[in-house]
């Protein structure tokens, strides 16, 4: 039996983490980080199948963190989806330019988030099998 995929949720607002966890916890193991610095530690420890990342955070922001994740040989293949209140085209394009595979805006629409996460986790698992 295949293990449950792990999703790392990174957001400096605990309420947002709770919302995302409630949407995804039935199908995924959820771990979380409240800062970019903590996220790097948790990502190395948990080896997530997908990362949901907020943009606006103190310290290392989401764009910087995505660059760091994509530059890390152990984490560069983990898909990153930005989940943020920044809904303008420029923010979305910037997120995709730094390595995110997708971009969803808050407030989160549960069915959309579930489908996007499922699609990207399935694609990652297929890529991993081919490697």
Predicted features along the sequence, with ranges:
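Active-site beta3 strand of CheY-like receiver
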Residues: 46-55
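Receiver (REC) domain active-site loop signature in two-component systems and cognate sites
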Residues: 57, 95
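Two-component/phosphorelay signaling modules centered on CheY-like receiver
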Residues: 2, 14-32
């Amino acid at each position: 039996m295949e293990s449950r995929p792990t999703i790392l949720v990174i957001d400096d607002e605990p309420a947002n983490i709770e919302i995302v966890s409630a949407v995804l916890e039935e199908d995924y193991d959820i771990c979380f980080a409240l800062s970019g610095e903590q996220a790097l530690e948790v990502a190395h420890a948990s080896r997530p199948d997908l990362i949901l990342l907020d943009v606006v955070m103190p310290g290392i922001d989401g764009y910087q963190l995505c660059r760091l994740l994509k530059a890390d040989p152990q984490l560069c293949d983990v898909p990153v989806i930005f989940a943020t209140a920044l809904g303008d085209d420029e923010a979305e394009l910037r997120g995709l330019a730094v390595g995110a595979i997708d971009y969803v805006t808050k407030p989160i629409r549960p069915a959309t988030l579930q489908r996007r996460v499922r699609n990207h986790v399935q694609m990652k698992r297929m890529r991993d099998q081919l490697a």
